[in-house]
Amino acid sequence: MQHLPNDTYDVTLDQFGQIATVYGDPGFPVATDVVGGNDTVTAAVAGLNAKLTIFGDDHAMLLGHSQGGNDTLIADIDGGWDTAIVIGDTQSMIDDSKGGNDTIVADAGRTVYTTISAFGDVAADMSGNAQGGHDDITGSIAWRGGANLFAGDAGGFMMDTSHGGNDTLDVSVLTTDGAATVSGDAIGSLRGLAHGGNDNLTVTLNGGSAISSGALFGDSAASLMDFAQGGDDVLTVKLDGQYAEAGAQMYGDAPTMVGNSHGGNDVLNGGAGRDFMYGDARIYEPATPGSITGGVDTLNGGAGDDRMWGGGSSDFFVFNTGSGNDTIVDFDQGNKAVGSTAVEQDLIDVQGYGFADWTALSKLISDNTAGDAVIHLSANDSITLDGIHATNLHPTDFII
């Protein structure tokens, strides 16, 4: 196995319209048994309309048993109208190649009209039996940023038997009119027998703007297809400011699940804004009735008025004091979305409210004018169960 040296590069872009592409291991050999160096790249952008690209290893395909290095890549953007993309390893990965365990900092928190993206392993696709590294990605976005994309592994698809790493992504939308798309594994679909890693995603929204937003996807920002398997992910939204309207969309696995795909056992923690939370997916297209399997997910909307879908399988909905006026859209009905007749047992956890027993709680449950059960937790907090009547609820539906 050939090992490349550990290199350090410092780059400054301080002129209008400068373009730079930096490689941690330039000229990475086209061979099947090469290990990239543990490189450090620091790039500072002060000019306007600059374009920066950083690869931890090289703009190539990682193949055979080759491995990316454990790189530290820092993009500090302080201009305006800039574009930056940071990739932990290479353009793509195939065979039994492995990504390095990279640390990426993509900071555009002091700019305007700047687009910044970061991918833990590859800019494009992972295929074969490629394995993503365990990467740590930190990003920040400022005023009117563009299509800011962050993924723990691939900027494209994951296919065949490729496997995502166990990644940590922490992205802040720091000012007005900003948005981020954050995926634990890929921006594109997971296909074939691809398997998502067990990832930890956090997005902090600036509550000083009602239009700050984030979209979090445990595995794919597009879909799980074929026999793809989602990882066991943790998604968290935080709100830093006053506007309750600043909210997020959260998908434990992907917006769409197709074929015979399988969701992971995910944990979704909403912020103080208005969140839309899907334990598995929003759209289901099973190959045959019931061929899609949902994970056993835990959804906690936090404060704010949230809407929650657990998806298939038995899920947990957790409510703490100050949880707001929330709606569970598919209580005990998630399997119907995939055409399954299997019985599920969702549970509503209200331990945080300190009810003595079922008798005390049941007195606070009644139907609204639409015939949906409403659980009145306090003067300001409630849970509405779409399509469920109060008489259909029992002590076994709750954790008290």
Feature-to-residue mapping (PLM):
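Low-complexity acidic/polar repeat-biased segments
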Residues: 362-400
